């Protein structure tokens, strides 16, 4: 009994001698310096995919602070005050995204957000065409080609147009070439001439199913070929009947100073319908004639009616084609 009383006395004595424990630890909820803070960790990905988006800017609107996602799309905000926080995500060629997070004291919120990417034009080209003819007048048109992709997948693409000034012309997708294409004739343009396009900035406009729009960097027409080569022989004005074993194409060259090559084309005519039976591309501009029977793998030409043409093609791919020259194989 005496031992128990002694221990109790000592305990009471020590308790009375010890001051209150200081509470200045900022991690101690009872401390005056304690701050109710949490964190937000997240990842920005391409919508409908698992690929992270690097270089996206995530901004905390409450505290006016921003971070940039790493190569895998991850980001972190530390020491955020407890409560609701608003964020906005921006990235070039992606639709902005906003979201809210309720930050809890002492905890880390995990967030994953998917961004919708606008379409991307990876290739764009416009080539001019002139088709000379006896009647009614030369035909002029342009071929527009564009390659367009979408970060969210090709199925996300909705529409693609060729744009000039306030005008838009729809482009059609080709399964064969995997490109979008349109042929625009001079009568489709305000001045009834493709010269209307010369010097004007041209664009490809694309839109996805979520209505995100991309307008390409401007591109321009390089040249309209007005001076084409002229067939000399065979010709209905010289000798329209040719032996099957002596077909020699002759023409006069164009009066131009730029680099170019020739394309020759031969078609058979049956009841007014033309069928291309032979062509030669990339013939050097130094040539002014070509012996058909020296061409490897040439087709056998049966007796009948034919027409041939010679086109001038510049280094960009623009071309001007001659009038058709008719003849007969006997």
Positions of the model-derived regions?
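Glycine-centered loop-to-beta-strand initiation motif
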Residues: 42, 69-77, 178-180
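Structural motif
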Residues: 29-54, 151-152, 315-318
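Short, compositionally biased P/S/T/A/G/V-rich stretches that sit at domain boundaries
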Residues: 20-26, 115-137, 219-247, 252
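Short amphipathic beta-strand segments in non-cytosolic proteins
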Residues: 43, 56-68
């Amino acid at each position: 009994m005496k031992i128990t009383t002694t221990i109790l006395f000592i305990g009471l004595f020590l308790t009375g001698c010890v001051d209150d424990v200081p509470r200045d630890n900022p991690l101690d909820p009872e401390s005056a310096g304690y701050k109710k803070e949490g964190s937000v960790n997240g990842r920005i990905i391409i919508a409908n995919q698992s690929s992270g988006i690097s270089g996206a800017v995530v901004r905390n609107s409450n505290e006016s602070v921003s971070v940039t996602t790493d190569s895998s799309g991850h980001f972190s905000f530390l020491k955020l005050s407890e409560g609701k926080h608003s964020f906005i995500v921006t990235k070039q060629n992606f639709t902005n995204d906003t979201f809210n997070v309720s930050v809890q004291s002492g905890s880390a919120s995990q967030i994953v957000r998917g961004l919708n990417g606008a379409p991307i034009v990876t290739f764009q080209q416009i080539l001019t065409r002139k088709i000379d003819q006896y009647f009614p007048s030369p035909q002029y048109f342009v071929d527009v080609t564009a390659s367009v992709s979408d970060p969210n997948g090709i199925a996300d693409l909705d529409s693609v147009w060729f744009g000039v000034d306030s005008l838009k012309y729809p482009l059609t997708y080709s399964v064969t070439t995997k490109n979008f294409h349109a042929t625009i004739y001079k009568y489709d343009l305000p001045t009834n001439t493709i010269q209307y396009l010369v010097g004007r900035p041209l664009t490809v406009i694309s839109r996805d199913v979520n209505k995100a729009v991309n307008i390409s960097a401007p591109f321009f027409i390089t040249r309209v070929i007005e001076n084409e080569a002229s067939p000399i022989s065979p010709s209905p004005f010289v000798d329209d009947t040719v032996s099957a074993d002596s077909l020699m194409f002759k023409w006069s060259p164009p009066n131009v100073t730029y680099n170019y090559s020739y394309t020759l084309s031969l078609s058979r005519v049956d009841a007014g319908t033309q069928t291309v039976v032979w062509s030669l591309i990339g013939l050097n501009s130094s040539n002014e004639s070509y012996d058909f029977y020296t061409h490897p793998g040439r087709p056998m030409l049966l007796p009948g009616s034919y027409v041939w043409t010679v086109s001038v093609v510049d280094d960009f791919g623009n071309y001007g084609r001659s009038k058709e020259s008719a003849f007969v194989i006997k």
